[in-house]
Amino acid sequence: MTAALLPRVGIGVDVHPFSPDRPLWLAGLHWPGEPGLAGHSDADVVIHALCNALLSAAGLGDLGTQFGTAEPEWRDAAGTRLLTETVRLVRDAGYAVGNAAVQLLGERPKLRERRTEAEQLLTETVGAPIALSAATTDGLGFLGRRDGLAAVATALVFPAR
């Protein structure tokens, strides 16, 4: 099999500190009663990590490359808007998304109550299966101190042509 026909894998990471004066958006869902995250857009670490993984897999760089903070049209942009545009870029580059997995890292909020809802939204937005999981750091580091959230994602794309 030639390299042009092989699937490609990307890894994405995103980290944001909490910002109590902002709403919390995670995996495209609003989380009322939880402190938000600081960032140029909505700071949805789950979607940002997923976008980074998809862009990496397609050889398109990362969120900063595609939607930099110098671009005013992306200020306060919804993560779902960034994800939709990322999927378009991946497809325009000649790839189809096979699947992806994202793990949220932090002490709160607890993902379990809304995991299925989040997976459905992400899967519909991407047009491919997206698995979502979460883990704590058992009180270690900035995540354990509840200073912010992080997410790590992997994505598989394959040539669509």
Curated annotation (Swiss-Prot):
Q: Does the keyword Lyase apply?
A: yes
What does the record give as cofactor?
a divalent metal cation
Catalyses: 4-CDP-2-C-methyl-D-erythritol 2-phosphate = 2-C-methyl-D-erythritol 2,4-cyclic diphosphate + CMP
Q: Its domain of life?
A: Bacteria
**Where, in this chain's numbering, is 4-CDP-2-C-methyl-D-erythritol 2-phosphate bound?**
14-16, 40-41, 62-64, 142, 145
Which intervals of the chain form a coiled coil? none
The cysteines joined by S-S bonds are none
Which pathway does UniProt place it in?
A: Isoprenoid biosynthesis; isopentenyl diphosphate biosynthesis via DXP pathway; isopentenyl diphosphate from 1-deoxy-D-xylulose 5-phosphate: step 4/6
Q: Name one GO molecular function term.
A: metal ion binding
- Which residues take part in binding a divalent metal cation? 14, 16, 48
Q: Name one Pfam family in it.
A: YgbB
Question: SUPFAM superfamilies from the xrefs?
Answer: IpsF-like
Give the enzyme's EC designation: 4.6.1.12
Which UniProt keywords are present, listed alphabetically? Isoprene biosynthesis, Lyase, Metal-binding
Q: How is the co-factor bound, per the entry?
A: Binds 1 divalent metal cation per subunit.
What the entry lists under CDD domains is as follows: MECDP_synthase (cd00554)
Q: GO terms for biological process?
A: isopentenyl diphosphate biosynthetic process, methylerythritol 4-phosphate pathway; terpenoid biosynthetic process
Q: Where is this site: Transition state stabilizer?
A: 40, 136
**Stated role:** Involved in the biosynthesis of isopentenyl diphosphate (IPP) and dimethylallyl diphosphate (DMAPP), two major building blocks of isoprenoid compounds. Catalyzes the conversion of 4-diphosphocytidyl-2-C-methyl-D-erythritol 2-phosphate (CDP-ME2P) to 2-C-methyl-D-erythritol 2,4-cyclodiphosphate (ME-CPP) with a corresponding release of cytidine 5-monophosphate (CMP).
The record's section on HAMAP family has: IspF
Q: Which family does it belong to?
A: Belongs to the IspF family.
Quaternary arrangement and interactors, per the entry? Homotrimer.
Name under which the protein is recorded = 2-C-methyl-D-erythritol 2,4-cyclodiphosphate synthase
* Species of origin: Acidothermus cellulolyticus (strain ATCC 43068 / DSM 8971 / 11B)
The record lists the lineage as: Bacteria, Bacillati, Actinomycetota, Actinomycetes, Acidothermales
